[in-house]
């Protein structure tokens, strides 16, 4: 009886294999995920459009690849000037959860945060003319005092806490507050350097030499150890297949989910939309004012 059961199981496996082959079900795939645009937490902008790279997008695409047993390796097509520090860090955390080989393919530009999210991939491929690097941080805080005066707006400010109003943009920073801002920026810079050092197996001292904020071409980046190979997407796909020990894999290009108009409205929030509608009479200056008041805190970015 046991012998018969074993034979039945073998026959069933052979039949399933034949069915999967005849139906064209791939057993070995390389998934290609396109990541294009600035790095930020939300979806594409309502008024200015354009794609963005968000943690939510990266998470959903990587989860799909992780759950597909036929996907043996992943290629990330990165085209980004960088963006929000926190979003870059969250995306890198998502990438580090993947146990399958990951190869990054750089396009025209993969700078600052675009490089940050790629630094811990198994391999990085860049075109000779790719612009990459730009390892550094920029923190911006607008001073709205002149704009308020132009618009005829006077503000009464009440605070509790020595530096509570330093982020309001209503006055110049004191020397002490400028030191606070610089220390925060330096700390984020150190975090960037640590990620690159770990991901590229370089000493922190070496990375600091490279981390001047300048851009490098793909050729320069390879010479400096910031990328592994020169080539395009096909080079990255072949390299990913090689890392996964797969010959002639099927390449599956993941389509980017386009957020609906409704989801974009929900992401922005009803109150913010209402503010935008009300501020249109103020023109460009009003929009700048709205954006600053809606989030008056510093905007440190890897860009």
Region spans (language model):
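N-terminal organellar transit peptides
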Residues: 2-104, 109-113, 123-127, 138-303
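Extracytoplasmic ligand-binding site segments that recognize negatively charged/polar headgroups
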Residues: 134
């Amino acid at each position: 009886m046991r012998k018969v059961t074993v034979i039945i199981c073998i026959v069933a496996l052979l039949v399933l294999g034949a069915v999967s082959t005849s139906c064209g079900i791939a057993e070995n795939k390389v998934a290609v995920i396109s990541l294009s645009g600035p790095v930020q937490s939300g979806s594409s902008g309502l008024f200015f459009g354009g794609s963005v790279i968000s943690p939510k997008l990266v998470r959903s695409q990587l989860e799909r690849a992780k759950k597909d047993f036929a996907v043996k390796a992943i290629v990330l097509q990165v085209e980004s000037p960088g963006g929000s520090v926190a979003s870059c860090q969250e995306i890198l955390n998502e990438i580090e959860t993947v146990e399958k080989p990951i190869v990054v393919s750089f396009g025209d530009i993969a700078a600052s945060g675009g490089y940050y999210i790629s630094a811990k991939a198994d391999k990085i491929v860049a075109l000779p003319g790719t612009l990459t690097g730009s390892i550094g941080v920029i923190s911006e805080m607008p001073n709205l005092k002149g704009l308020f005066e132009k618009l005829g707006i006077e503000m009464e400010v009440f605070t509790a806490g020595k530096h509570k109003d330093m982020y309001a943009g209503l006055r110049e920073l004191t020397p002490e507050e400028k030191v606070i801002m610089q220390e925060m920026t330096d700390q984020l810079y150190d975090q960037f350097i640590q990620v690159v050092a770990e991901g590229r197996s370089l000493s922190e001292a070496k990375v600091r030499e490279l981390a001047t904020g300048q851009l490098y071409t793909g050729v320069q980046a390879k010479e400096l150890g910031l990328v592994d190979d020169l080539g395009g997407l096909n080079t990255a796909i072949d390299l990913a297949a090689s890392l996964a020990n797969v010959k002639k894999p099927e390449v599956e290009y993941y389509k980017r989910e386009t957020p609906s108009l409704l989801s974009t409205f929900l992401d922005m929030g009803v109150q913010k939309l209402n503010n935008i509608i009300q501020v249109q009479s103020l023109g460009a200056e009003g929009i700048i004012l709205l954006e600053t008041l809606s989030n008056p805190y510093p905007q440190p970015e890897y860009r």
